[in-house]
């Protein structure tokens, strides 16, 4: 994990096109031809490339996923996806095994990452999964990339990370909020609302997504009359609720994390729950949190794949999670994306013949299909056989097509639209 201290970071440029109403794709143009990685050189971000490794590879992988904090409900499905991928890869016998060290990202209030990231780096990991929260990822990304370690998030959606100077070491399997904001803004307008308010988490995820919703909704002829913000760790939201309600909105968008559990009771005592809109940071099962019917009819969006289309994978992920002594998964959000992140890292290591972060980073775009000429494959074992046979793999997994561009962003994405039923459980209605 050698780092060149005075190296120039990647210069990034935001390039987004082709947003559509339910499923959103960003096409980065013609894919470039594959290039050979020369051992002994450096990456464009200034990390030293190690030599190819002989024999079977062992990848040391860590995670900084939300086991605590305001996104803790995403911790179980993400860890479940990671463990299943590790087990599948280790059982495949394709020339690589993974040593997995899980960790807690926490949030920007409890700052669990301040102890976990040093622990993982000291353990010698070459890649870290996480965080789920974009704002949390931004708190430790510099520490990770300074060591030429890959940071790979299954759930970060902030557009700020597209242009972040990450030395070419940051990747994600969730699409940018440019896509979710477009879909959500169009959905609200399609539902007939003309004047909306928002309550917004004051971080890169919250304010960024709020802006993209605003852009989409106003382009459709709507008006955003208020968008009060709050900070992570706040516990009283009376002022934000009052500001959101003051202009008599038709609908209210809640761009929050777990704080929504505190916001909802006070808000729906003054505003119909059916006219609320949720986002990926808070779209989850509230059957044991609120009275039946409290959220019936409310809608929300999140990047993901329809569970009905990956039923076998969902069952395997849940069964594997339960077999490890955990309770059955209540939500599945970002589990498939985490699984695919682990598989892509393993495939990149095989292609690079190295488990060093710098070397893997140079092959992740290729194994995702972002470099022209690959053979499509859908499991780790299938793709590994292609690579081990001298071919070029193009992996698509349970989260769907990935296809990294040169910035480490996926160029395809699907946005689900869900609606709460009478039990306050979100059910997919489109996407």
Annotate each PLM feature.
Residues 2-23, 27-431:
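Extracytosolic ligand-binding ectodomains
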């Amino acid at each position: 994990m050698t780092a060149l201290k005075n190296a120039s970071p990647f210069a990034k440029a935001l390039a987004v096109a082709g947003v559509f109403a339910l499923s959103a794709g960003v096409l980065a143009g013609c894919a470039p031809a594959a290039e050979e990685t020369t051992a002994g050189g450096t990456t464009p971000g200034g990390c030293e490339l190690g030599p190819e490794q002989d024999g079977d590879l062992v990848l040391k992988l860590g995670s900084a996923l939300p086991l605590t904090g305001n996104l803790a409900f995403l911790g179980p499905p993400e860890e479940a996806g990671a463990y299943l991928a590790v087990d599948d890869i280790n059982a495949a016998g394709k020339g690589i095994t993974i040593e997995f060290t899980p960790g807690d990202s926490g949030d920007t209030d409890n700052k669990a990452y301040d102890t976990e990231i040093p622990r993982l780096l000291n353990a010698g990991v070459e890649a870290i999964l996480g965080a789920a929260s974009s704002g949390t990822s931004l708190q430790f990304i510099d520490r990770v990339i300074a060591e030429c370690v890959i940071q790979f998030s299954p759930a970060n959606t902030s557009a700020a990370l597209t242009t972040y100077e990450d030395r070419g070491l940051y990747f994600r399997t969730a699409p940018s909020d440019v896509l979710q904001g477009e879909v959500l803004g169009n959905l609200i307008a399609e539902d007939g609302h003309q004047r909306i308010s928002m309550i917004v988490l004051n971080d890169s995820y919250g304010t960024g997504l709020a802006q993209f919703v605003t852009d989409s909704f106003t382009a459709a002829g709507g008006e955003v009359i208020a968008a009060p913000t709050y900070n992570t760790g706040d516990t009283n939201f009376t002022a934000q609720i009052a500001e959101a309600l003051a202009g008599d909105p038709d609908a209210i968008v809640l761009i929050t994390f777990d704080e929504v559990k505190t916001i909802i009771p006070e808000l729906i005592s003054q505003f119909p729950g059916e006219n609320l809109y949720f986002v990926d940071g808070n779209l989850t099962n509230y059957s044991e949190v609120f009275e039946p019917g409290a959220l019936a009819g409310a809608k929300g969006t999140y990047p993901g794949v329809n569970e009905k289309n990956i039923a076998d994978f969902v069952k395997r992920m849940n069964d594997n999670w339960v077999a490890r002594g955990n309770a059955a998964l209540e939500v599945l959000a970002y589990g498939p994306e985490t699984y695919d992140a682990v598989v892509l890292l393993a495939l990149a290591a095989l292609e690079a013949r190295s488990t060093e972060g710098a070397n893997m980073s140079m092959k992740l775009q290729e194994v995702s299909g972002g470099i022209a000429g690959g053979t499509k494959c859908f499991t780790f074992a299938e793709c590994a056989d292609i690579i081990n046979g001298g071919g070029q793999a193009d992996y698509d997994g349970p989260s769907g097509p990935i296809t990294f561009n040169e910035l480490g962003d996926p160029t395809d994405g699907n946005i689900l639209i869900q609606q709460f039923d009478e039990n306050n459980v979100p059910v997919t209605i489109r996407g």
